[in-house]
A protein has these predicted regions:
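Periplasmic/cell-envelope proteins involved in peptidoglycan metabolism and beta-lactam response
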Residues: 1, 10-204, 208-213
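Metal-dependent nuclease catalytic cores in nucleic-acid-processing enzymes
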Residues: 216
């Protein structure tokens, strides 16, 4: 996105999209993917320590909960996270119905999927002021709309976790210290949620800007 913005300012929209430009960068796709995941993991871990802020929304599960979930907008770049609704809140697990995918014609898929989230993957959301939160039902309730994600994205039939979109933002820049080439740039948690690039557009504190030079 930063490359697009730079080219737009230098050449204009017409030359950018129809001028036949060939652009090469030093970005490494593998490191870019690793960097994005590292930033997301760090933001999520930090945000969890601040506590659970509650469900995204609440819906009635008596009817077709898939239709109700389908009406809730979600960022397009959240995969493998999925929006879901709590169908059962048992002592040791929650049964979560996942938001149906949309077909090419825009209609919702008729198939309804559900996954189980064990208490061990939910207990981080316990309130520190309530020592008796020892079951899923003490944290979640039927009808709660939440985010869940597979513990292993390559194994969707495995364990799933309760997730929460972090309020804190962040950015990441990875460079080769020998050549100065930029290998990865991550501007935030979700580009769909915010196009502000915290790695490029944010103004860092002078002390923080000087640290890479000191530690190098």
């Amino acid at each position: 996105e930063e490359v697009r913005r730079t080219l737009m300012s230098q050449y204009g929209e017409e030359k950018l999209y129809s001028g036949g430009l060939s652009v090469r960068t030093t970005l490494d796709p593998r490191l870019q993917q690793i960097g994005r995941q590292a930033l997301i993991d760090g933001l999520v871990d930090f945000d969890r320590k601040k506590g659970w802020r509650g469900p995204v929304s609440r819906i009635d599960t008596a009817g077709d909960w898939g239709v109700a979930l389908g009406g809730i907008e979600t960022p397009s770049d959240m995969a493998p996270w999925r929006l879901g609704v709590v169908l059962e809140a048992q002592k040791t697990k929650a049964v979560v119905g996942l938001k149906p995918s949309r077909l090419q014609n825009g209609s919702l898929a008729t198939e309804r999927e559900a996954v189980e989230v064990a208490y061990d993957e939910i207990k981080w959301a316990r309130s520190s002021s309530k020592k008796d939160n020892k079951s899923v039902g003490d944290i979640l309730a039927v009808g709660d709309v939440i985010y869940v994600a597979p513990k292993d994205p390559a194994n969707l039939s495995g364990a799933w976790m309760l997730m929460q979109i972090p309020e804190v933002g962040g950015g990441l820049v990875a460079m080769d210290p020998n050549t100065g080439r930029v290998l990865a740039v991550v501007g935030g948690f979700s580009f769909a949620m915010s196009q502000f690039d915290r790695a490029i557009q944010a103004r860092r504190q002078p002390g923080s800007s000087f640290k890479p030079l000191v530690y190098a």
